[in-house]
């Protein structure tokens, strides 16, 4: 995982402020002025503990995504929420993910001794495509009725491949748990979004992770949220 300017500066013997950081996919335009204004307007609240239920935030996110706040759980960045998701994935016989993959996925899966395997995306003339070996293994899993999990990010990091929503539908039909990391979805025009948030209510085996880090350029705020069945989120919160 990139973005550790203090560490890089110590190696280069310079100030972190002079380093141009290309190691993390953060929006180069910086945080929205409205976000900075909101932070400044609430500085006085730093002396008080926040609401542990984050009800105002959950309500605002619920209005934005048109979903009940009980289906939303804010976290200490998407990384914390991915950790809890990987704990649930570790309960499956095996979890698959497309590779190359964001390094934090392997970290979180290993933390719970999850059995997992990668399926390589293959470079083709018009972009990166799902390998035939994955399709064959998927058919074997269907035949053996194994308890299988799947973890993917959409758009995919680092290839930039955007998967159609129909791929997730196919996964939901035969995977015990599907976790979709949509950290980069907001970089797309709304007309090109392939988010599956609107399917969560009909699919208890679906978890969607969102982040304010990448598009809104707020990595220091450490804010992400999960959208999933309330029973799962209550278990995570405990």
Describe these PLM feature segments.
Residues 53, 201-238:
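Conserved core segment of the aminotransferase class I/II
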Residues 17-18, 68-72, 93-94, 182, ...:
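Short acidic capping loops at alpha-helix termini that bridge into adjacent secondary structure
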Residues 117, 121-190:
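Active-site phosphate-binding strand-loop segment of PLP-dependent enzymes
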Residues 50, 62-84, 98:
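Short loop-beta-helix segment that forms the pyridoxal 5′-phosphate
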Residues 1-48, 144:
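N-terminal "arm"/small-domain region of PLP-dependent enzymes with the aminotransferase-like
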Residues 88-110, 122, 132:
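Conserved PLP-anchoring active-site segment centered on the Schiff-base-forming lysine
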């Amino acid at each position: 995982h990139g973005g550790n300017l203090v560490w890089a500066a110590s190696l280069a013997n310079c100030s972190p402020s002079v380093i141009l950081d290309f190691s993390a996919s953060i929006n180069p335009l910086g945080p929205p002025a409205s976000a900075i204004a909101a932070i400044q307007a609430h500085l006085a609240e730093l002396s008080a503990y926040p609401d542990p239920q984050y009800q105002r935030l959950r309500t605002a996110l619920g209005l934005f995504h048109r979903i009940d706040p009980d289906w939303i759980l804010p976290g200490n960045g998407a990384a914390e929420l991915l950790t809890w998701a990987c704990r649930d994935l570790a309960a499956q016989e095996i979890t698959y993910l497309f590779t190359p993959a964001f390094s934090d996925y392997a970290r979180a899966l290993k933390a719970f001794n999850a059995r997992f395997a990668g399926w390589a995306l293959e470079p083709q003339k018009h972009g990166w495509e799902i390998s035939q070996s994955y399709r064959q293994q998927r058919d074997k899993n269907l035949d053996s009725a194994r308890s299988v999990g799947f973890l993917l990010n959409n758009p995919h990091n680092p290839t930039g491949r955007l998967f159609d929503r129909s791929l997730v539908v196919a996964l939901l039909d035969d995977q015990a748990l599907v976790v979709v990391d949509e950290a980069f979805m907001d970089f797309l025009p709304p007309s090109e979004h392939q988010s599956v948030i609107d399917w969560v209510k009909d699919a208890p085996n679906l978890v969607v992770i969102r982040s304010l880090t990448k598009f809104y350029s707020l990595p220091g705020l450490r804010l992400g949220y999960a959208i999933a069945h309330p029973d799962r989120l209550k278990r995570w919160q405990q």
